[in-house]
Amino acid sequence: MKNLSKFTIASLILFLFLAPCAQASKPVRIATIGASPLINKNQSPEALVEQMISFWQGQINQVINSKLDLIVLPEICDVPVGLSTSEQKIYVEARKDKLSDFFAKIARENNCYIAFGSLHNTDKGLRNSLILLDRAGKIAGTYHKNFPTIPEMEQGVIPGDQSPIFQCDFGTIGMAICFDLNYDELRAKYAQQQPDIILFSSVYHGGLMQSTWAYSCRSYFVSAIGVVQLPSEVLNPLGEIVASSTNYFNYTLATINLDYELAHLDYNWDKLKKLKAKYRDAVSIHDPGKVGSIMITSEDKAISALQMAKEFDIELLDTYFDRSRMFRKKRLEKAL
């Protein structure tokens, strides 16, 4: 501390003073688009690339005027549907970074993040990846599909083995692709890390597995499904659908607030009543029913959900579960 300048010390004190407030009320505007680029493949690879750019420009035009923070697109959305393995290889070589550059331009011009699924060559081989672009159009993170299907791997796709968490200016993001959703070992990694949002790009929906992932990871869950007949959705950390595409519109928009905490009703009933009585519209206490868990969300720009919970000594969900585990362990030891 002796070697720090007065300016550095003052800055540190200011940061520590403001930090608790920095997390309060964090609305994020999201769009997810479910679409499959069906185009005339009887053309040169270069012409196919131009068709793909035109297709996605039209799709993104549906949502781009909504002042978005994040756009999520489906799995391998930079490759046309219906190509054979050999045709895919020729197309990917001709495409190079043209689709990525196109999405980067959209991100840059509209000051938003974009996550898109890509089949692309890397120094380790062919990858099925979800690529996150930041507001400047630069790559903020890349997730490689951990569990490709057997046919994918037979066609050359190399599995990933990491579950990275990416930091955005609005919060943290984890990712999964299609078949990944079936694997508890991947979900368990994210459940430990608890990102604010999990992005799921896919050509399969996953059904109840989406809710399982959202609740067990304590995360918002945003899916972009590359089959227009299947809904692309936004789920809250309790596993409930809060926004969905429909049979009429292949996209959906949602504003989600990342300043939330989960708690259990046990031991918290009266505390929750007092919390609501004090903060009124500045706090949302949402009960999905049937599970005993609730979500506390701060609508106040100065006070976070965590600060509210601490003020009324509200025990959070995972803390309560851990306390129950320890109590059980002691009872078992006493019984032996």
How does the language model describe each region?
Residues M1-A10:
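Bacterial N-terminal signal peptides that target proteins for export
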Residues S36-M52, E154:
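Acidic/histidine-rich helix-loop elements
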Residues N121-Q193, S202, L208, S216:
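Active-site catalytic loop in hydrolytic enzyme cores
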